[in-house]
From Swiss-Prot:
It catalyses: (2R)-2-phosphoglycerate = phosphoenolpyruvate + H2O. Its cofactor is Mg(2+). This is Enolase. GO terms for molecular function: magnesium ion binding; phosphopyruvate hydratase activity.
Length: 428
């Protein structure tokens, strides 16, 4: 009864008003799975290809009708009659159909939509939630959220070099409590910014992007907000940064335009981070070096890898081949997981499993262009990854993931677990 009888894709809009792919997979039993594909703003050079039409007369060239056509005509013709529960075989067939390293024939957006919709249809067929279908009885760990509450860098027009400032309510006893703490800090930050005369409009991911004077001021207003919300920095709440250092890198140096000494070598940038870690309760730094500066990554990992989580996003792009090379070279100690960077569910699960075997942490992440699709909420619980990065406590395209996690926590009941600070198991 899990035989695939129809596959249909359409062009829909993401949270930034850009087209993306939505796929529906229908089974013989009448079950249906639907998945919408996210889209990144700042992307790694080695990410799987997001296929766009390039037709300037439609959506400024960002249409996805080619990818939609690939689903409706190429992929559907091959997969009709397959059992949707054969996820690994289905994903392997998609990879073979595409035949390229970076999914450039069919488009990772076409392939991922089909891959996820098949999994959702199978879960529906079996009467299971997606996290239950993917994780079985062992999938029960609710994640510690990274709430992106303040933006700089490429995500904002201000004097802050670092792209994302996040709070992690690691002192909470449950996901529900962690989310409440994060939301309260978000509102407290709004009040702090207003009091200082700053704009409180939010960006793509729901974080504030005021015209702050420096990286230091960004950290200071967040510390003030944590205290104003009634929490203790370093005890109840930890900080995480996404530097997006590839955006700052040119000619072998990093340009932090708003620092006293703007141009920094990898060693000097590492010292800059070490100083921040000494003075603020920072537990995680993502993309602290440029994706191609592997020597810089090694310097950073050697100096801070025992103290904080060092996350590779653009560095690894959820690609097990690249990730294995990083593990072998002792680079970073964590991987950011983005489904559309690699293009199939199976390859995503393999990356998470590889991280665990190597003693790395895995942080499941959204993209800046999101939809109402909540797949990553189920994925993070199914895999017991322990951490999720899906924006601020603002904007429905972000909050829908948090709300799905609240539902999952309720559904699990006494079986649910939440590890708080212990998610950083490789720092103990």
């Amino acid at each position: 009864m899990s035989e695939i009888v129809d596959i249909y894709a359409r062009e829909i809009l993401d949270s930034r008003g850009n087209p993306t792919v939505e796929v529906e997979v229908f089974l013989e039993s009448g079950a249906m799975g639907r998945a919408a594909v996210p889209s990144g703003a700042s992307t790694g050079e080695r990410e799987a290809l997001e296929m766009r039409d390039g037709d300037a007369a439609r959506y400024l060239g960002k249409g996805v009708l080619k990818a939609v056509d690939n689903v409706n005509n190429v992929i559907a013709a091959e997969l009709l009659g397959w059992e949707s529960t054969e996820q690994t075989a289905l994903d392997q067939k998609l990879i073979e159909l595409d035949g390229t390293e970076f999914k450039s024939t069919l488009g990772a957006n076409a392939m991922l939509g089909v891959s996820l919709a098949c999994a959702k249809a199978s879960a529906e067929e079996l009467g299971l939630s997606l996290y239950q279908y993917l994780g079985g009885p062992n999938g029960r760990e609710l994640p510690l959220p990274m709430l992106n509450i303040l933006n700089g860098g490429a995500h904002a027009d201000n004097n802050v070099d670092i792209q994302e400032f996040m709070v992690m309510p690691a002192g909470a006893d449950s996901f529900k409590e962690a989310l409440r703490m994060g939301a309260e800090i978000f509102h407290a930050l709004k009040s702090v910014l207003k009091k200082r005369g700053y704009n409180t409009a939010v960006g793509d991911e729901g974080g504030f992007a005021p015209d702050l004077k420096s990286n230091e001021e960004a950290l200071e207003v967040i510390m003030e907000a944590i205290k104003a919300a009634g929490y203790k920095p370093g005890e109840d709440v930890l900080l995480a940064l996404d530097v997006a250092a590839s955006e700052l890198y040119a000619d072998g140096k990093y340009n932090l335009a708003n620092e006293a000494q703007p141009l920094k070598t990898a060693a000097e940038l590492t010292d800059f981070y070490a100083d921040l870690v000494d003075r603020y309760p920072i537990i995680s730094i993502e993309d602290g070096m440029a994706e191609n500066d592997w020597d810089g990554w090694k310097i950073l990992t050697d100096k801070l890898g025992k103290r904080i989580q060092i996350v590779g996003d653009d560095l690894f792009v959820t690609n097990t081949k690249i990730f294995k090379e990083g593990i072998d070279k002792g680079i970073a100690n964590s991987i950011l997981i983005k489904l559309n960077q690699i293009g199939t569910l199976t390859e995503t699960l393999e990356a998470i499993e590889m991280a665990k075997r190597a003693g790395y942490t895995a942080v499941v992440s959204h993209r800046s262009g999101e939809t109402e699709d909540t797949t990553i909420a189920d994925l993070v619980v199914a895999t017991n990854a322990g951490q999720i990065k899906t924006g601020s406590a603002c904007r429905t395209d972000r909050v829908c993931k948090y709300n799905q996690l609240l539902r999952i926590e309720d559904q699990l009941g006494e079986a649910a677990c939440f590890n708080g600070k212990d998610v950083f198991y490789n720092l103990r």
